[in-house]
A protein has these predicted regions:
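SAM-dependent nucleic-acid methyltransferase catalytic core
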Residues: 21-145, 150-153
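Conserved phosphoryl-transfer catalytic core
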Residues: 1-37, 168-174
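SAM-dependent methyltransferase catalytic-core segment centered on the flexible catalytic loop
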Residues: 1, 132-133, 140-143, 148-175
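Intrinsic disorder/low-structure terminal segments
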Residues: 3, 16-17, 65-66, 148, ...
Length: 175
């Protein structure tokens, strides 16, 4: 289990998004996940990996179902400066959130039809579409993608908060 008392605020600027107690819990959770499901490891704790996925989905948003105070919709991670402006405009400070409760509630929603079927196999590859040596020819039935909005969307800066939680330096990700 996560020792919630172990969380130390490493980035004070994130207090624009989170109540201090919430941010400490997020830091404790980040550490717990990093110990059990390190990125790039061959063998990770699938429960910790699941919790990371759910937590990243709940980092910021515009309702009490997110860890942050009121922000933009979750697909629009704003900068610290923009979040401070939102807080000032609304006259609010981020409220304390129940990190474990939010993760549990979202997990129940995601698994409302039961567990993920064991036969479902998926893989994530980051490489040019024309060069995927780890995928056998004629073995793919469906590819789901989003069109690149390279002139509109700034993927690294738009995902900075998710990268922080996952322990990824946005500049290190090739886009």
């Amino acid at each position: 289990t996560v020792d919630w008392s172990k969380g130390e605020i490493e980035r004070e600027d994130l207090l624009a998004f989170y109540h201090p107690a919430t941010l400490k819990k997020l830091e404790a959770l980040r550490s717990w996940i990093a110990d059990r499901a390190p990125l790039g490891a061959d063998c990770v704790d699938p429960v910790a990996d699941w919790i990371r996925m759910v937590a990243i989905n709940r980092l910021s948003g515009h309702s009490p179902g997110f860890f942050s105070g009121r922000s933009m919709p979750p697909n629009q991670a704003v900068s610290v400066k923009a979040q401070l402006k939102i807080n000032e405009k609304l006259g609010v400070s981020p409220p304390e959130r129940d990190v474990a409760g939010i993760i549990l509630k979202k997990t129940k929603t995601l698994l409302k039809d039961g567990c993920v079927p064991a036969q479902v196999r998926s893989s994530l590859h980051t490489a040019p579409a024309w060069d995927l040596p780890n995928i056998a020819d004629s073995s793919v039935d469906l590819v789901v993608t989003s069109p690149p909005f390279l002139d509109i969307v700034q993927y690294a800066s738009d995902n900075w908060l998710r990268c922080w939680f996952a322990g990824i330096e946005p500049e290190s990700v090739a886009i």
